[in-house]
């Protein structure tokens, strides 16, 4: 028989068999950018959940306000819900304006005067602020002029009684600030009691000048005979201007300006002793959107 060698199988060392993770160092704290990247999917999921929840509530509110059966409109798209909400809010705004006019007939004039004041402030800022793109400035002022045309084209109030003060008529003033120190803006007045054609009056044309000022070109049929103009005028700072009048002379604009068929608007400069007091009309409180 072979001799017993007495050899034993080698056993694994407890140190060698220890897992490698036992010697792993703890994680370092993540930076803010890494934390944002890791939490971005969670934040996006929460944001979408908030949007969907708000749209669901808005859908129930708008269907209830429009008195529509929610079971027949159970699968409205998000765009449909938003469009229905916008239309409903516009109708509410018109209804509130009509109710305010029935309670106080001077509200519309105050609204126009307030919008005009805001437009003058925006125009003054754009004229004095440096670094504003000329195209952006022209588009913004063109949009404001279009909005002003829509406001002026709204239903006018009946003429005030003979004994009513003149300041209740709420004339509309439109003025652009000058870019030089030697000129002051002279507002031309359009009484809100005068009837204008809304289809024609809304079509203002904005023509920028080389010196940074802007001019509004108004079509010929926009003003019936005897009506006052709505256009910015400037006069010398030492001579006050009282009223403006409309001439039937036709204007031939320079080349490149689409202004054919327009009427020229003149201003009559009178001494201060003969001038009236139209400034008192603007002391009436105006409506402001803030």
From Swiss-Prot:
One of its GO terms (biological process) is regulation of DNA-templated transcription. Residues 1-47 are annotated as: Disordered. A motif (WRPW motif) lies at residues 287-290. Residues 35-92 form the bHLH domain. Keywords: DNA-binding, Nucleus, Repressor, Transcription, Transcription regulation. Pfam families: Hairy_orange (PF07527), HLH (PF00010). GO terms for molecular function: protein heterodimerization activity; protein homodimerization activity; RNA polymerase II cis-regulatory region sequence-specific DNA binding. Residues 111-144 form the Orange domain. It is found in: Nucleus. Residues 10-23 have a biased composition (Low complexity). Residues 25-36 have a biased composition (Basic and acidic residues). Transmembrane segments: none annotated. GO terms for cellular component: nucleus. Has a particular type of basic domain (presence of a helix-interrupting proline) that binds to the N-box (CACNAG), rather than the canonical E-box (CANNTG). Transcription repression requires formation of a complex with a corepressor protein of the Groucho/TLE family. Transcriptional repressor of genes that require a bHLH protein for their transcription. May act as a negative regulator of myogenesis by inhibiting the functions of MYOD1 and ASH1. PANTHER family: BASIC HELIX-LOOP-HELIX TRANSCRIPTION FACTOR, HES-RELATED (PTHR10985). This is Transcription factor HES-1.
């Amino acid at each position: 028989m072979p001799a017993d060698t007495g050899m034993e199988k080698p056993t694994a060392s407890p140190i060698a068999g220890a897992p490698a993770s036992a010697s792993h160092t703890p994680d370092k704290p993540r930076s803010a950018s890494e934390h944002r990247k890791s939490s971005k999917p969670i934040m996006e999921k929460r944001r979408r959940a908030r949007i969907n929840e708000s749209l669901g509530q808005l859908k129930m509110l708008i269907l209830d306000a429009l008195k529509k059966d929610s079971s027949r409109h159970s699968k409205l798209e998000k765009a449909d819900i938003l469009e229905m909400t916008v239309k409903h809010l516009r109708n509410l705004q018109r209804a509130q304006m009509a109710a305010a006019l029935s309670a106080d007939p001077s509200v519309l004039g105050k609204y126009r005067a307030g919008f005009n004041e805001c437009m003058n402030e925006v125009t003054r800022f754009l004229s004095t602020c440096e670094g504003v793109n000329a195209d952006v400035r022209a588009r913004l002022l063109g949009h404001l002029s279009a909005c002003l045309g829509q406001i002026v084209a709204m239903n006018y109030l009946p003429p005030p009684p003979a004994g009513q003060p003149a300041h209740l008529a709420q004339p509309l003033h439109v003025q652009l600030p000058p870019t030089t120190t030697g000129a002051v803006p002279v507002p031309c007045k359009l009484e809100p009691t005068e009837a204008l054609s809304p289809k024609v009056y809304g079509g203002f044309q904005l023509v920028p000048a080389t010196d940074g000022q802007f001019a509004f070109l108004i079509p010929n049929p926009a003003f019936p005979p005897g009506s006052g103009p709505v256009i910015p005028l400037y006069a010398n700072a030492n001579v006050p201007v009282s009223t403006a009048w409309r001439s039937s002379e036709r204007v031939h604009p320079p080349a490149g300006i689409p202004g054919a068929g327009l009427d020229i608007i003149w201003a009559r400069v009178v001494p201060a002793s003969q001038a009236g007091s139209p400034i008192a009309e603007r002391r009436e409180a105006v409506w402001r959107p803030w």
